[in-house]
Amino acid sequence: MAFINENYLKLPGSYLFSEIARRVDNFRKENPNAKIIRLGIGDVTKPLAPAVIDALHKAVDEMAKEETFKGYGPEQGYSFLVSKIIEYDYMPRGIRLDEDEVFVSDGAKSDTGNFQEIFGLDNKVAVTDPVYPVYVDSNVMAGRTGKYLANGYFENITYLPCTAENNFIPELPKEKVDIIYLCFPNNPTGMTLSREELKKWVDYARENRAIILFDSAYEAYIREKDVPHSIYEVEGADEVAIEFRSFSKTAGFTGTRCAYTVVPKKVVAYTKNGEAHQLNSLWNRRQTTKFNGVPYIIQRAAAAVYTPEGQKQTKETIDYYMENAKIIKQGLEDIGLTVFGGVNAPYIWLKTPDGISSWEFFDIMLKEINVVGTPGSGFGPSGEGYFRLTAFGSRENTLEAVERFKNLKF
């Protein structure tokens, strides 16, 4: 008899965005003529930059010729891409990295979900709350979280509430933790940490031999000068932090899949008898066993993001989305809602009015004005009473959604 991994049975219901899709599909069947505007899941809508498309075409042509054909590539990524990542994303901020500290992958979702595999099951995990569901769910699957409780928490996870009451800035945990997930600019709240606030976490990790898993997938959307783009801008972070980045939101690669993870060789974790081991070598071992690398043509496309044309074109797209964020934020404030985010991130986090629950507000938005967002409670118990909208729609749909907001009744 084959036995299942019973930890999967601890996962509550379906994945958040699957549940949203189910509800929207049911509504569409009952209302086939409704024009639904989707401001929920964070998928982009603008096409890939011309420089990226040109590089894709050239790479595809290379694959058609015997002398330039590429088969299996390095699991860690081709040097032509890794060198550009270091040159453009880190060196201008005074951060020095070796090429073997950067691992190209098929997505930050994959890496943030998979990185926990190299840690023991008895590590104490801390997450901000609300939080991107992958961080928690992947630890549930591994068997690290204990039981799911009636209050929406897992018994062995330390939750760090981020609400309007603390300006969405998580406090250091009162109990000792070993693995800390941080995402800034934050998904879902759209809020950020200053360099001083981030330093507190680095200092905590250094003092407690903890590891920070830092998701900075939205760093390209930062507008304010005092907001760090990388955790490695903080002294000592290269001893305790892993950083995840993605081309998905930076350059529209949600459908082409390319990202990277930085694992400095200084970062170590320990065996039970106290022996230190580099996470870099462990992650490399994991990747070479379970991952065959990102396709050559996709990495050529990603490298084109760093050309002068690619930089200009991707910045224009990011500016487009951030203008959408400004429009949504202003539109919601104009009808009297309390709104956060949308300044350094493409996410708008609003307080639901009159004590309405997150899912109740979802249903009101869908049924009354045919606009889809994401219930805050889907990101964790501290997200109850909040709602996320994204700026990744078209300008036309964004403006139309803002007009529809005026018809909301609550």
Curated annotation (Swiss-Prot):
CDD domains on file: AAT_like
Signal sequence interval, chain numbering: none
Enzyme Commission number: 2.6.1.83
Keyword Transferase among record annotations: yes
Residues forming coiled coils: none
UniProt xrefs under Gene3D superfamilies: Aspartate Aminotransferase, domain 1 (3.90.1150.10), Type I PLP-dependent aspartate aminotransferase-like (Major domain) (3.40.640.10)
Superkingdom of this protein's organism: Bacteria
Residue(s) carrying N6-(pyridoxal phosphate)lysine: 249
GO biological process, one term: lysine biosynthetic process via diaminopimelate, diaminopimelate-aminotransferase pathway
Molecular function per GO: L,L-diaminopimelate aminotransferase activity; pyridoxal phosphate binding
Sequence positions that bind substrate: 15, 42, 109, 132, 187, 292, 388
Catalytic activity: (2S,6S)-2,6-diaminopimelate + 2-oxoglutarate = (S)-2,3,4,5-tetrahydrodipicolinate + L-glutamate + H2O + H(+)
Cofactor requirements of the protein: pyridoxal 5'-phosphate
Subunit architecture: Homodimer.
Assigned protein family: Belongs to the class-I pyridoxal-phosphate-dependent aminotransferase family. LL-diaminopimelate aminotransferase subfamily.
Protein name: LL-diaminopimelate aminotransferase
Organism, scientific name: Acetivibrio thermocellus (strain ATCC 27405 / DSM 1237 / JCM 9322 / NBRC 103400 / NCIMB 10682 / NRRL B-4536 / VPI 7372) (Clostridium thermocellum)
Phylogenetic placement of the source organism: Bacteria, Bacillati, Bacillota, Clostridia, Eubacteriales
Gene: dapL
